[in-house]
Amino acid sequence: MDIEAYFERIGYQKSSNKLDLQTLTEILQHQIRAIPFENLNIHCGKTMELSLEDTFHQIVRKKRGGWCLQVNHLLYWALAMIGFETTMLGGCVYVPSACKYSNTMIHLLLQVTISGKTYIVDSAFPFSCQLWEPLELTSGKDQPQVPAIFHLREENGTWYLEQTKRQEYVSNQEFIDSNFLEKNTHRKIYSFTLEPRTIEDFWSISTYYQVSRTSVMTNTSLCSLHTKDGVHGLMGTILAYKKFNYKDNIDLVEFKTLKEEEIEEVLKSVFGIHLETKLVPKCGNVFFTI
């Protein structure tokens, strides 16, 4: 595995060799604009492999994306390779339909320490919940970013990531009441602790989410990729684009229903994904919103 091949994959030309916040932010932003969050292997009859070698091959060599257990694993490797003090953490994702956080740890995120200051780094959460910059590990502080205002709060050793989003204007009126739109201005995203994790801690949940009939990953084919001013999303046959703060503190949201035969070309042109086997698009109960 070659770190230069990773940098080429994300289109990053090192501006300096400093292990500082600017470099960390640049790498994060290049990754989220080059590597999609996606679970398409599950809907192509393939498995989502977790080993670093398999992840590197899929994302770097085959120019695919992956889910958090792959994409953030790759980012962990890259940051550690160039010398950042990096730790894997595990998170419990908020389930809106149940009004609670998942019972088990299902999300991989990263902690990075620079000159004694700690940040949360995450390159693999779908749509507008995605961080564009590292978050200071500080409780109760508003941290405005392009997608939204993010907040971290700590209670008894557990940290909670939340966001406050802008109002939205939906250009396609037939989607005005879509379940893919987040109805609440304030959104809970996930909780986590600072207990160090390894990729082996996620093996059993990875298997479960690939085979369980109730898993969001088996129920919905997902793809999400950020641009310099917004985010593209594909949920089943629904294509969406959100442009952040397009005017007067309002986000523009556009939807389009694709025909199945259009999906392959959209994956190539919008997300940079070339599939080797046929995708069976699926959209079950809506879990993620644009």
From Swiss-Prot:
List the catalytic activities from the record.
Answer: an arylamine + acetyl-CoA = an N-acetylarylamine + CoA
Organism of origin is Mus musculus
Q: Subcellular localization, per the record? A: Cytoplasm
Q: Does the keyword RNA-binding apply?
A: no
- The positions flagged as active site in the entry are 68, 107, 122
> Which one of the record's GO molecular function terms can you name?
L-amino acid transmembrane transporter activity
Where CoA binds, per the record, is at 208, 214
Question: What's an example Gene Ontology biological process for this entry?
Answer: L-amino acid transport
**Keyword Cytoplasm in annotation:** yes
Q: Keyword annotations for this protein? A: Acyltransferase, Cytoplasm, Transferase
The entry's family comment says: Belongs to the arylamine N-acetyltransferase family.
Stated role = Participates in the detoxification of a plethora of hydrazine and arylamine drugs.
Binding residue positions for substrate: 106-107
Enzyme's top EC category: transferase
Q: What is its main location?
A: cytoplasm
Q: What is this protein called?
A: Arylamine N-acetyltransferase 3
Under the cellular component aspect of Gene Ontology, which terms does the record hold?
Answer: cytoplasm; plasma membrane
